[in-house]
Design a protein with these regions (language model features):
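Hydrophobic "anchor" residues on beta-strands that sit immediately upstream
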Residues: 20-22
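Flexible, D/E/H-enriched segments
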Residues: 1-18, 31-131
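Catalytic metal-binding/acid-base residues of hydrolase active sites
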Residues: 24-28
Length: 131
């Protein structure tokens, strides 16, 4: 919730001044391998991706609002690994408007040796500076 306090912030801010910022992350981890109770676990298609998309949209709105603490809490619930970078991006660029363009997922059942469903979803998003 304090992006300006992240390690190496000054260096990142200097580099980002005249740069396009591109990041990767999975904003939604779901399923048995991520601690979801089996009776609540959704297959990625079609219901899981709808849930992931809704969750990612909530995250976008929190970043737009500059609600760093709220976004932090949202990332805990969504099991997002995008916590620091999204907040840092907003902090560096100021007011932004975000759009979820597409969403994809990776099946992680073999990776974690867990039963299905175990998967992670990431959104293809763009953020534009509000002028």
């Amino acid at each position: 919730g304090q992006p300006g306090d992240l390690p190496n912030f000054d260096e990142v801010a200097r580099i980002a001044e005249n740069a396009v910022i591109v990041t990767t992350g999975d904003q939604f981890h779901h399923g048995i391998g991520y601690g979801t109770h089996p009776e609540e676990a959704l297959d990625a298609e079609p219901d899981g991706l709808r849930a992931a998309g809704s969750s990612i949209e909530v995250g976008i709105r929190l970043i737009e609002a500059g609600d760093y603490w709220g976004y932090n809490q949202h990332c805990v619930i969504a099991k997002s690994d995008d916590r620091d970078v999204a907040q840092l991006f907003r902090y560096l660029r100021g007011p932004l408007e975000g759009t979820l363009l597409d969403i994809g997922y990776s099946d992680a059942t073999e990776l974690y040796g867990q039963p299905p469903p175990t998967w992670a979803a990431g959104g293809f998003m763009k953020f534009e500076k509000v002028v």
